Amino acid sequence: MNQEKLIQIKNLKTFFNTEAGIAKAVNDVSFDIYKGEVLGIVGESGSGKSVTSMSINRLIPNPPGEIVNGEILYNGEDLLKLSYDEMSRIRGKDISMIFQEPMTSLNPVLRVRTQMNEILVKHDGLTEEDATQKSIEMLDKVGIPEPSRRINDYPHQFSGGMRQRIMIAMALQCNPALLIADEPTTALDVTIQAQILDLMMDLKESRGDSAILLITHDLAVIAETCDRVIVMYGGVIQEIASIFDLFKNPTSPYTKALMDSIPKMDVKSDRLRALKGMVPSILELGDECKLCSRFDPEDCACCGTKIEPELAEVSPGHFARVSKEFLV
């Protein structure tokens, strides 16, 4: 893997002001994305995965949301200090995104041609005719049949899988350095999921040192596609490791519980193993250990002290949010 850093995220905090209080959706998160790698973020719903990705692209709606602290460095430049126009020149060109819901991500009243061409005209300065030709080529690359005809159709004339292919084509049109894929296979059947993931990996390989940030709750997808993985819960990182280290030696009790919840084909069992309790509301999370409500004191990362452990390096390149006592 290339060791040149593409994105550096330092002490990122993204909060939402609500009538019930301040929701700390992302609370002091730091990690790097390297050129050419596929970095996964996994966790339950409400763990802060999507808010992290939206923060990178500065798409947090304000109000009620706000990035209250941190740095997001792209090639050494802090994206949080850029003006709206400066960020608009990066968003969609250097950093692009595939959104979570393909059925609603496209504008229903505009033809596909109009939506795809807009990106190329804005960022690459192409004429409408040249933009249309490049858009047709991209639709062909992502497997849309008869692209020269279908480019004039409206989104409702495509299936969910085809709409996601269009979203991938749009995201990759300007050869971005970073592609953020926020649960790109949500609401798609298993066969289409596999096709979409294969397509993303094939297109990435053809683009050399471009990176992918893949957000999902599916550990099987993570295992198949990623080089490294971040496990999030409660708005903080619980573990960061290479894909090999994470599956061979998960350290955080939360990561271990996620692994245990995966059905094993070679183990006969009457019932599935599941984490006890529910994901607490972000409004209910304070500065104490986020895992206490899901684990018995002796099994928790804080060993029952309720003090939030620091993210510590447990082996080279492998970090986990556990206390020293937990590692003994």
What are these regions (language model features)?
Residues 173-177:
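A short, proline-enriched helix->beta-strand linker immediately N-terminal to the Walker B motif
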Residues 184, 188, 192-270:
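P-loop NTP-binding/switch modules centered on Walker-like glycine-rich loops
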Residues 79-96, 122, 245-250, 282-285:
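ABC ATPase NBD coupling module
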Residues 116, 168, 179, 192, ...:
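Hydrophobic anchor residue at the start of the ABC signature
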Residues 71, 78, 129-149, 259:
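Conserved ABC ATPase "signature" region
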Residues 4-5, 22, 145-149, 243-328:
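Short catalytic/signature loops enriched in Gly
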